Amino acid sequence: MHHKALLISLASTALALHGSSSHSHLGKRFTFPLPSSKGSVTFDAPKIISGNTTFDGGMKTYGRGVECTEGEGGDSDAVFWVENGGTLKNAIIGADQIEGVHCMGACTIENVWWEAVCEDALSLKEGSGPFTVIGGGAQGAEDKVIQHNSGGTVSIDGFTVYNFGKLYRSCGNCDEMFERHVTVSGVTAVQGSTLVGINSNYGDTATIKGDVCATDVDTICQEYEGNSSGEEPPETGSGPSSACKYSEPLPAC
């Protein structure tokens, strides 16, 4: 009886060790560092941040008082519109919204956190940038966190993204297509499908710095063949290339 119990104990220990080895990345539970909210504000319409002005949200939570869904919304469903040259900083976007933040020209998004991503967190709608994201983070995006519809350059620095589809996607089938460039630095990415997606046939590039960490992210840089006909763009390759500029492997977070 003692011998049988010993065998069972050894088998259980071996199984536990195997599970620990094969799923070691699950051993450290990631906690999304959402800041504490200092109050809540519900808008009846998008809050407009005029060009070349700064709105400091004071780390309050901002929403629209609607159910968070993946349905395609419009500009009128955004929480904030940031006009050309405007800055949104120190804000939490609540789960009671659909479209998050829309940049209607060059913008700076600094220390902005999304409690939940519904359609997209941040949509870059007009102009050629620069579009600058500094700090902040987002979680729970079934698809895209940052959607880039216009042209130009995007910088994403120090952002935290957790449980996501894509951190950044250059629109693959907009009516009007542009060349787009994104630089990703200091980003913490955990449990996602794709870090960045670009259309290399339009001259897009993604530069991913060595201080980016990724844990349980399936694809770091995915290339597509974009189009302006509305068709679903096919994947054309992934990994380091002349369009996807980075070195593998990225460090784990």
Swiss-Prot record:
Signal peptide boundaries: 1-16
Gene expressing this chain: plyD
Keywords linked to the UniProt accession: Calcium, Carbohydrate metabolism, Cell wall biogenesis/degradation, Glycoprotein, Lyase, Polysaccharide degradation, Secreted, Signal
Recorded family membership: Belongs to the polysaccharide lyase 3 family.
Location of region: Disordered: 224-253
PANTHER family reported in the protein's UniProt record: PECTATE LYASE F-RELATED (PTHR33407), PECTATE LYASE H-RELATED (PTHR33407:SF11)
EC top class named in words: lyase
Protein name: Probable pectate lyase D
Gene3D superfamilies: Single-stranded right-handed beta-helix, Pectin lyase-like
GO term, biological process aspect, one: cell wall organization
GO terms for MF: pectate lyase activity
